[in-house]
Amino acid sequence: MELQQDIGFVFHEKWFDDWDSLIANSRHYGKYYKNYDETLLKEYLKRFRLDGKKKYKKLSKGEKLKFAFAFALAHHPKLLLLDEPGANFDQTFREEFHHILREFTADGTKSVILSTHITSDVDRFADYLLLLKKGRQLLYGDIESVRDAYRMVAGCFLYTSPSPRDYAASR
């Protein structure tokens, strides 16, 4: 139980009460954390433009993740475990999210483990990269070594429709 005190979790699974407000939810679940700081939670709610009086059920997916992120930060964890948090954030908030993660880890005493499919998230603030496929490790290393050894390739599928000549020949 002591270890749990030092970990902030943000997952897509719902674990807050639908019919309670954000503040009521945070008070209820905050009592399980000895370092829970309601003042800090309210600062993050304001920063994330979330109304603490709003019912959890009325939030969008992105707002629910913002609230979970605020709650995770509000008990002063040493480690944040984040499962695809940016998937439902708009680009503007994603920038704020990255800024907060940099603030969180700035003093070198705290860490973030982030699961993501958004490779730009990794490139912006990761120190280490672990690449998994079906639960098996494909790659692990510090980000600079990975950059030196591998190249990220991005592209798009170019659809070309048949030319009129091809269309005529097939009739």
Predicted regions and their residues:
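Catalytic Walker B motif of ABC-type/P-loop ATPase nucleotide-binding domains
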Residues: L80-E84
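ABC-family P-loop ATPase nucleotide-binding domains
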Residues: Q5, F9-F67
